[in-house]
Amino acid sequence: MKTVNRFILYPALFVIAILLGACERIVITPSAPAPTIVIAPLLIEDTPLPSFVQPTSLPITPTIDPVYFRDEFDDVLGGGWTWLREIPGQWSLEKVPGSLRIAGGRGSVNAETMTNILLRPAPAGDFQIQTLLTFEPDQNHQFAGLVIYQDNNNFIQAGQAYCRGGGCVSRGIYMNHYGKGLIVPPNFAQVYKNNVVVLRLVRKGTSYIFEISGDGKVFYKVGSHESDMTPLQIGVLAGQNVDGISTTVPAVFDYFEVSSP
């Protein structure tokens, strides 16, 4: 009986010793205390916002489109146009799609006989008008181009023309200034025999500057006039055949643009 108890007792003591040793080696780390949530007072006035959300105090200047008006001469004329002495059968938006075609006949502005002058109100202050013109004049004084207009006695027209006589270069570029019904020289005539040209007429105060370009990017000054007229209307025109020949030469305007100079 004692032998049996010894065999039973020793293993039991051995197991107990192992368990006690393991207990000595196990370190029970207390769990971390739950985080304490502290609600701090708002410090909007005392604490600056991060720099990337700081509001700016600089005023924002709105972008101003330098183009006041542009007509591509597509299916119908843009708003604001009026015809002076219109002959409907002599102008078209269909014969050259995307362009205004005017059959330039006889008559002149100062004689109040030129037909189909297309005009719209001029902006206040400084401005410039521009068009791409295709024109091949071959009769004396035939003219097509831009016009800044007060009335039949006070206006400036600038474009391509054919002119014989004193101060003329036959086919070329011309700028005509009429003041109080009289032509004001010079006309800044320059030989130009290409059919296509970009015309630009600029108003700056009392100065009127005529520029041309072959590509619409680089412009060359033709000349300038001083005028105290009040520019009321702007637009395009074609005509001025004074030879009495019934032949008309079409002038084709690809677009008309009014913008800040």
Predicted regions and their residues:
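C-terminal motif of bacterial Sec signal peptides marking the signal peptidase cleavage site
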Residues: 19-22
